[in-house]
Structures are given as C-alpha cells and as structure tokens.
Amino acid sequence: MKKISMIALTLMMGAASVFAQGWGRPPVEDPTGYKDTYKDYFTVGVAVNINNVTDPDQIALIKKNFNSITAENDMKVVSLQPREGEWNWENADKIANFCRENNIPLRGHTLCRHSQFADWMFVDDKGNEVSKEAFYERLRNHIHTVVNRYKDIVYCWDVVNEAMADGDGRQSPWMRTEPNPYRQSRHYKLCGDEFIAKAFEFAHEADPNALLFYNDYNAADPAKRDRIYNMVKKMKDAGVPVHGIGMQGHYNIYGPSNEDIEAAIVKYSEIVDVIHFTELDIRINEEMGGGLQFSRGKEAPVPAYIQTLHQAKYADLFKILRRHKDVVKNVTFWNLSDKDSWLGANNYPLPFDKDYKPKAVYRTIKNFDPALDNAVIKEDFVPSVMNQPQAEYPMDNSQGYARFRVEAPQAQSVIVSLGLGGQGGTVLHKDENGVWWGTTDGPMDEGFHYYHLTIDGGVVNDPGAKNYYGSVRWESGIEIPAHDLDFYQVKNDVPHGQVVQVLFPSPSTNSTKRAFVYLPPQYNGKKKFPVLYLQHGWGEDETAWHNQGHANLIMDNMIAEGKCEPFIIVMTYGMTNDVKFGGLGGFNFKDFETVLVDELVPYIDANFKTIAKKDSRAMAGLSMGGMETRAITLARPEVFGYYGLLSGGTYSPEDIKDPSQVKGIFLSCGGKEGPDMIMKAAETLKAAGVNAKGYASPGTGHEFQTWRRSLLEMAPMLFK
C-alpha cells in the first residue's frame, strides 16, 4: 500500500517554513545572539551564579548572547561580609575574573539593601544598637572595600535597592497621617532617608567613574513610581550622585500594563539620563509572596495560549525599550535559564528553558522588525468584507493591519490567532468597560486568513466574522484587501457560471460523498468541456476552493476576458483530515485515489457534459492536496493530462518516465515560501522536454492569496 510518510506530511502542514528553508536542507544555527541584534539599542545582560560561569555549555550561551553580567547573589553584602571583617571573595572573584577573561563588563549588585544585608552593622558586640555614625562607618568601609576591589571591571553599581514602600500610597480612614513613602527597614529606622544619600556618596568616593543606580521592583506601578521619582529628585537636588534608576522588571504575563511601563520610563527620564532594566523575568501567573513560593516546582507543560501571552508580554516590553533607547542603556535578564531562576522552572520566566534551550520567546525578542517599532498605523479602518451582517468588527485598514473588538468582561485573557509574526497571535487588552481591543503588530499578507479567539484557554469563533472550514473546524475568516483583488471580484457585467452540489456513491468507503462542481457560463448541457479536479489542503474540505478561494469567480472573470478556455472544476473532500498531528505513522492516499479516479471521475463523466479523455482532464491541489495530486497523477498517468502542485512540492524528470505522458505541469508557491526550489524544478522539467511552468506569488506565504493567484496563472496553460 502506498503511503505518504508522516515526515513529509508534517512538512506539508507547515509548508510555510518548509519552503522557506528548503526540503532536506539541515537547519543552520544562527551565530548571532542578543548582544548582536541589540548592538544599536542597549547592552543585554544576565544575572549569573557560579555554575553558569564554570559550565562550558552555559559559558557558550553567555558569550553568544550577553555583553553585561550581574552577580545574582555573590556580591550582596551578606555574601561578601557576613560578619565584620570576615570576607568571602571566592565566588565574586570567580565571576569578576570570568568577566575580565571574556571582556564582559560587570554590573555591581548590590551595596545596600534591606534584605540579604549584614545585620551586624546595626549592633555592637553586645547586641546593642549602634549610632547611625557607627553604622555609616561600617557601611562606608564595606562599600569602599568592595568597590575598590572590582572597579577595573564593574561599570555601574546598584547602590541602594528597594528603599521605597509598597502599596498605593493612599491614606486609610483610620490613619492619622499619610503613609510613609519609605520602607520601614532597619536602615530607615536608624537613619531616615539619609542612609540613601550616604551610600551613594561612599560609592562615588570609591569609584568616581562608575554609574550609580537606585534600583527597585514595582517601579512601573504609578504610586510607587511617584515615590521613587520624588526620592531620587530630592537626592539629586541635594547633590547626591544618583546617576540612574534601575527598574527591576519582575513582571507577569498580565501586568504591569504597557502604558504604565512606558509612563514610568518617561517620568524617570525627567530626572536621570540612564535607566537600566536590572532584573527582568516574566512569570506566567500573578502570584506574590507565599503563593509565589508555592508555585515554584518541577517544570510542567505550559498551555499554548499561556506561551502566547508570555511571548506577547516580552515582545511588547522590548518594543517599548527599543523605543526609548535614548535613555534605556541596559536590559538584564534575572538568571540564565528557568533552571536557575528564583521563580522556579514551573513559572516559565525566562527565554531559556530548564535545559538551557531557547524557547520561542527567545526568537520573539531577538528577531524583531525595527520598522514596526515606530510604525504609524493609519486610522482608516473599515469593517472586513467577510463580517457578519451589521458587524462592525473585525476591521482592516489600507496598510493591511487588522483590528479586533471582543466583549468578554469576566475574561482574564483574549488572544486572536493572527499576528505576532506568526508566533501565536495578537493579545488583546481590556478597557475599563470590560471590552477587549487589539490591532495586529504589523500588516497582514494580502488575502484570506483563518483565525479564532482563545479566551482564557477556550477556543471560540469571533462572533463578528463569518465562518469558513479550515484547521479541521469552522474558523472565523478575514480578508485583507489585495492590490490585485479585481481578478476574483463579483462583476455585474460578467456572465457567471454556477457551483452545484452533487452527491455521488462511494462503494469503496460504503458512503455517499459530496462534491462541488463549477460549470462555466457557456455550459448548456450540449457542448462538452474539459475538467480540472481541484483539491484543498489539510484541515479543509470541498467548500474551500469556491468559498475561500473564489475559484468560480476567478474562472468567470478569466473566461470573460478571453484569458482561458472554459472548463469545469470539480472539488471534493480529499480525506486529508483523517490525519492528526502525532497520530498515524503515514497517510494512505490510495483510499482517496480510489474515490477520485474510480468513483468520482466516472460519476462526473456520466452526469455532466465532459470530454472524457486524459488530455482533457487535469488534477491540481494546494498544500497537502498537492501531495495527493503528485501521488495520484504518478500512480495513474493514464487518467490526467495536466498536473498542478500549488505549494505542494515538485516533480522531477525522473518522476516523468515519458515526457509525452503529460501535456503540462504547473508548479507554484508563495514568494515567502522559498520559491527558488519551485522555479528550479520547473526549469529542470523544461530542460527534460516537459511543458512546465513555475510561478511564485509576490509577497505571500502558505495562504489562499498564493493559491488564488496560482489558479489565475495555471488556467491559461490548461487544455491547449
């Protein structure tokens, strides 16, 4: 029994990438990393532990991607001097030496923090609290010792961390005074906010050339943002050498909002010239405190929609950061991989997984399109031509952007399966009325696109759009108007054929099957016509070519313009959807060959006025339908005289034993599918004496606009 291998089948189902890379071609590893793609924007750093800088594979990952390093914990006060005069330099020195050996600048972290500090600085040898002067002397000694030891490799320091209070800053009814903006740490209780100024003064004394940062989490929260702003402004007005603000960036897929992040950058840039994102990770939940501790654990499968939210959050954030490259000068990921993360692998926080392999989000961050960062979207949106009656959304504009509106006030997330560079979809954002809005990150390819909504993990159709069968389900559809759409438009002055449904018996499957038959305007039941058997792709059915593909309108217009001979088109279900990803080890095309050749062709010849000869019969198919076409035409060369593969592979001269056995071969794909292979195959066939034509649809991929144009190009060569 003849079979199509599952490997080949998978290639066809994902043919956009297949054609782009070329069949049989081994993947080429990209030698560039974050530091290369962001060289014109900011340095990209990573927080490391001692294992990261001693394991060869992890070292290679660091050297490829990062041009700034932070010691995650090994330069904190308690790590370096847990007791007065007792210094632990081993790990910090190893990390510093790694940076020296590899010429990677080091971010110093951190000189003064409420946690992981040295409590001995606050008490004497009898346990009594010391004066603030004694505390300052100890703090100065620590800062000078550390800064001087590493000043040759450290280019900046997080001097003071997390000195500001959390909360929204509002005064509760029972409070006599407004809440204190400062964290009630031992430092603050002993010294007030003077300890902040002193720490910066001590660091600047030790290294006047180092950039000095105040660093805090929740720095995009509007209330805390203002507290940080006011404190830093107060310090700078007093002459304290605060050079920059560090926004830690411990975010989650639901927040903070893009608007709050950008507003914080803009506000901070009023008082500092440099902003670093110092501790970036994005977890997949909103848990804090004990709940966050509980959610750590063994890495578990992450639902696809959560991965999309994760990618979108990182993509949105980096777009904002690139937009503010004038002030954002460093972005540091807080750990190398999920395995190292303080959040745990189960929270999925970083671009590298627990095995140090890049996730899809790695490529989302790295392979950005600079043209889209500051793109100006024209506000000339109009309802899609494929909307339900009276539905305003979805919309599209003259540039090819699509905009969506969904009412789901109780939902936590809404994703449209279009956009994000083909990497998952467009994440919508909820307004104050519970309505979700979103616009694709960039223009869509011209033509028809399937899509659906994912609301909190549940897949539903867009109530505003009409439905079309694709992806083995009824999907929503949207049409991005093409510059050349005239060839498939309904025209009042053009005679129209008809599409009729037929039910034909299939003894081989013990069922009655359905086909749609396009009859040209000239069909009157007297004259006989040639026939094209035209197949859909995986996930579709016999409705695809006349609904999504507009095959009937394309033919009407071409016939009216005298561009091709009138012929019949037969469209039936190719039995492709019995194949499931990861399921069967192969696809048996022999069953469909029997249905098509031995049952449908005789039925059509018996019930319609056809020229029942090989040279007046053609078979073509798109994507997986092209695979079927290739297999059946080679298996039954006595049946079809013309072959067409539309994003469905190629023929070679070795396949065609006798050039006279075939009247013509048409090969096509989208211009984004790697057309060189198609064009070369067509030229090779022609050199072998076969009448062959190759075509690449400009600016499209593995999609219906490619196949509409392919039919337009193929039809004139048929039945000559």
Report residues per predicted region:
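Aromatic-rich peripheral "rim/lid" segments of glycoside hydrolase catalytic domains that contact
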Residues: 27-30, 34, 81, 88, ...
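Non-catalytic cap/lid and distal C-terminal segments of serine-dependent acyl enzymes
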Residues: 377, 390, 397-425, 430-720
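Bacterial Sec-dependent N-terminal signal peptides
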Residues: 1-24, 371
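Structural preference for beta-strand elements that scaffold enzyme active sites
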Residues: 41-45, 68-70, 105-107, 154-158, ...
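Substrate-binding cleft and catalytic face of glycoside hydrolase catalytic domains
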Residues: 31-32, 64-82, 90-213, 217-219, ...
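Acidic-and-aromatic substrate-binding clefts and catalytic sites of carbohydrate-active enzymes
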Residues: 26, 47-58, 77-90, 117, ...
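Short, acidic/polar
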Residues: 50-65, 138-146, 224-235, 261, ...
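Noncatalytic carbohydrate-binding groove/subsite architecture in carbohydrate-active enzymes
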Residues: 30, 37-42, 49, 54-56, ...
